[in-house]
Amino acid sequence: MALTADEKTQIINEYATHEGDTGSPEVQVALLSKRIADLTEHLKEHKHDHHSRRGMQLMIGDRRRLLDYLKRVDINRYRSLIERLGLRR
């Protein structure tokens, strides 16, 4: 369920804006999106796992705030990221 180190490294390398980038909004949103997708699959089987559901809702809020920030700062990077991740907006 948790991201393995290899998965995390692969996502970071794919969405990094420069070498050694682990904190840009793009990387953070991509990592959150992967964790949200994994939790969504978990919750399809375990419908009464409310603790995990709340954690997922908090992650969705974090991702929303990061996307709002990116949209406010650089609309082109925002649009590119939304398209690459396949998020609805």
Swiss-Prot record:
Record keyword Cell cycle present: no
InterPro entries hit by this protein: Ribosomal_uS15, Ribosomal_uS15_bac-type, uS15_NS1_RNA-bd_sf
GO CC annotations, alphabetized: cytosolic small ribosomal subunit
One Pfam family here: Ribosomal_S15
Cited SMART domains: Ribosomal_S15
UniProt keyword annotations, A-Z: Ribonucleoprotein, Ribosomal protein, RNA-binding, rRNA-binding
GO biological process entries: translation
Molecular function GO labels: rRNA binding; structural constituent of ribosome
Subunit description: Part of the 30S ribosomal subunit. Forms a bridge to the 50S subunit in the 70S ribosome, contacting the 23S rRNA.
Stated role: One of the primary rRNA binding proteins, it binds directly to 16S rRNA where it helps nucleate assembly of the platform of the 30S subunit by binding and bridging several RNA helices of the 16S rRNA.
Assigned protein family: Belongs to the universal ribosomal protein uS15 family.
Protein's UniProt name: Small ribosomal subunit protein uS15
